[in-house]
Amino acid sequence: PVQLVMATPPWRLVGSGRLPATEARRKALFGDKGTFPLFASAASSLLEEDGRFVCIISPDRLQDMLAALDGAGLTPYLLQYIHKQKTSPATFVLIEARKGAHAKPSVAEPIALYGQERFFTLESLAFCPFLR
């Protein structure tokens, strides 16, 4: 068993949106209703008790992922919304779930990636120094 599993599951549903030019990109970005349960189940089988599963998805699929986590015995622990700019809708949601936990999830302060001049914000650089 491991303490941490990280993933970026394909969150777009097949048949929605514009398809990428390559098959590899299509597989990376598009899945079906069974994709999230597969990822959650695989993560759960790899994790030790109280291990963490962290993933990033589109906010419009949040309910689907929460249901998949519940079905795999993973409890959402932390949600954090990622915005392109402070005034724009969330582009992504970062989810941390724990195996066998019974805590209520908390919502962290949202992160805005870009400021007015399209440069990374200090908060986004603090969150991910690799953006420098």
Task: Tell me the role of every PLM-derived stretch.
Residues 12, 30-31, 83, 108, ...:
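Generic, ordered loop/turn and secondary-structure boundary motif
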